[in-house]
């Protein structure tokens, strides 16, 4: 991340506002008690089809989505989630297993209230630098809708469609969804609308910022729950779209 000091200074100012107090990031970049995720490499890329029958998925460990950021207590029948990650030099691949008893996608415009439908959210910080990213590409917060679009805020401070960064597919099996996603990884010099943006080529040993969440709505005007994979010790619990210091670390492991 470029200009880290200025970025963190801005973030501290935002979180110092009344009602938004939060602990300072450890060592200026990340908060305490972050999860250390690991992703095995895939000799052959999984097919993104919601079936997940490739043997490479057996090498990856499940990680829970079980931290309630917003909303009331929920039952395991209402929501349960877990995920695993693998990688190739071109992309990372995420397999998510979701229990959601009611699926909602009521906002037909993909750029309007996309967080209030059932949404898989994947947070990525290419260089694990932390800091603010709400209207920059220091990190990405991809909101995956049930129609497999990926939305994030752009540098113009408006929602943008980043579906060209990803592949997404899900299938329903009884009370569960298997949701597979492939994501190109971009550095913080990404420029919206530029024709020459190129994904980062991935290598073993690379460490990125990473976090997963799910917005659950069972029929209300607004989402009813927001559940993530990282704890938030203080301050607003739903600020992952602003603060990459909340992300865990994702290390890309050598092929076994």
Predicted feature locations:
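Bacterial N-terminal signal peptides
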Residues: 9-18
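Bacterial N-terminal signal peptides that target proteins for export
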Residues: 1-9
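Structural preference for beta-rich elements and adjacent junctions enriched in aromatics
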Residues: 21-256
